[in-house]
Design a protein with these regions (language model features):
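N-terminal amphipathic alpha-helix/helix-capping segment at the start of soluble metabolic enzymes
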Residues: 1-18
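Hydrophobic faces of well-ordered beta-strands that scaffold small-molecule active sites
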Residues: 16-20, 46-48, 115-118, 136-138, ...
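Conserved, mostly hydrophobic/aromatic
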Residues: 19, 38, 128, 162
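Active-site beta-loop-alpha junctions enriched in small/polar residues
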Residues: 21-23, 51-53, 120-122, 139-141, ...
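Active-site-adjacent beta->alpha loops and helix N-cap segments on the catalytic face
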Residues: 27-28, 95-101, 126, 138-156, ...
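Catalytic domains of carbohydrate-active enzymes, especially glycoside hydrolases
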Residues: 33-52, 131-132
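A structural motif corresponding to the C-terminal end of an alpha-helix
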Residues: 41, 97-115
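Glycine-rich, proline-tolerant flexible connector loops at the mouths of alpha/beta enzymes
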Residues: 44-95, 124
């Protein structure tokens, strides 16, 4: 947990984070509905994921038409077949814009629920800092991505680090990166 930053209010009961991730499917309205339902359910925070696909993947030819349950327009999917289509990553239709994230941050403030976003790349870190997030969160998969951890640590922003599947030695190394800054 973050110490002495006023970012997370410590209390005796657990701090509940509702993981929304990219389950909004690129729809701002659905993201807001998920925030509202999370608040009604008693969550203290909602957490999204932000990525800049151009930073994360090599530019390769598209291998297939993006279809299946992740389809945004629902016209290229036959749900009765119960067959998943091919999902060409990155499916940019699932991403929200920086403007959308700012709107979600304001919506969370209005509902009095904490707004958390896990960035997956340096461009996303910069975008989140620009919109004024209170803190950053590193996904467990990136807890041993020491270059990325150092980049985030250099921003001197309060940070929560998930450490699932990390060894004790790896956690200490990640911790030492943040202590340098």
């Amino acid at each position: 947990m973050v110490k002495n930053t006023g970012v997370i209010k410590f209390k005796k009961s657990p701090y509940i984070i509702a993981e929304i991730g990219i389950n909004h499917n690129g729809y701002l309205g659905l993201a807001k509905k998920m925030i509202l339902e999370s608040k009604k359910a008693g969550a203290d925070a909602v957490k999204f994921q932000k990525r800049d696909a151009s930073d994360l993947v090599n530019k390769l030819p598209q291998l297939g038409k993006s279809t299946g349950y992740l389809s945004k327009n629902e016209k290229d999917t036959n749900h009765k077949s119960k067959k998943f289509g091919t999902w060409v990553y990155p499916d940019l239709r699932l991403e929200l814009t920086d403007k959308d994230y700012l709107e979600l941050k304001k919506y969370c403030k209005k509902l009095k629920i904490d707004f958390i976003v896990t960035p997956w790349d340096e461009k996303s870190v910069n975008s989140l800092l620009k919109i004024g997030v209170n803190f950053l969160k590193i996904a467990s998969i990136d807890a041993t991505n020491y270059h990325f951890c150092e980049y985030i640590a250099s921003k001197k922003k309060a940070t929560i680090i998930s450490t699932g599947m990390s060894t004790y030695k790896e956690i200490l190394k990640t911790q030492s990166i943040f202590k340098k800054f």
